[in-house]
Amino acid sequence: KSLPAPVVKLGTINFTGEISGFFDNLVAFGKLSSSIGSIQTDLIFGSNKDKNIAAYLRGRIASSNLQLHELFGENNPFGEARFDINIDTRRPVGGNFSGNIQAQVKEFDYKAYKYKDINLSGNFKKSSFDGTIHVNDPNGELYAQGIFQHQGQNSLFNFTARLDHFRPDRLNLTDKYEAPNISLALNADFTGDNIDNLEGSITLDSLSFETTPSSFFLKKFEVVASGHSLDRQLTITSDILN
C-alpha cells in the first residue's frame, strides 16, 4: 500500500544532532530535515519507577521555515509556518497518558495572508480535553476555550468563543461583501452522548454584521434542548424568532 502523497513529498528525512542517555532518561537534541524544511527538537523520554511513572515525554519542538504549501497540490491555500511547541506528558504505571501542550504559531500563511502569534494551550487525559486558542490579528481577534469529558451518557461539552472585528475580506476569505466587519460571542454547553439524550444550550450573543452600506445586529439567539425519550423539547429564543 502506497504512502499518502503529503508523506511522500517530505522526501528523505534526516536527523542531525545527539541522542544520548539511558532508556529511563533519553535525550534527543537536534534537527529533523526534510524537503519542506526543518524541525528542531529538544526532547527527553524516560521513566521514573521511584515516582510510579511508567513513561514520560517533555521538551520542545520548533520550526522557523516549514513550507507547508509543498505538501499539497497546486493552488492549495497554505504557505509557510513558524511555530514553537512545548509538551509535558506522562503515563503512570497501569494508567494512561495525560499532559499539557503549549504552542505558539509565530507565523502561518493561509490564502496569501500571514497570521502571526497564534497561542494555543491544552490539557489532555484519557477521556477529557480542555484548551484555549487566542488569535490577536489586526483583522480580527478570536479567543476561545473549551472542555470535553467523555463519560458515556453524562459526557460534558462546554465551549465559549468571542470574535471581535473580524474582517474576512482582508483575510482573503471572501469577496462577496464590501468591508464586512463581524463580532459575536458564542457559548455551547451540553451533556449527553447522542441526539436522543443531549441536553443543553447554544447561545449566540451580540452578533454584529456590518458592511458598506448596511448593518445587522442580533442581540441574542438561543437554542435549548431538554427532556428524554418521548418527552424531548427544543426551545428557540431570539429577538426575531420565539
Which residues fall in each region the model found?
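Interface amphipathic segments
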Residues: 1-242
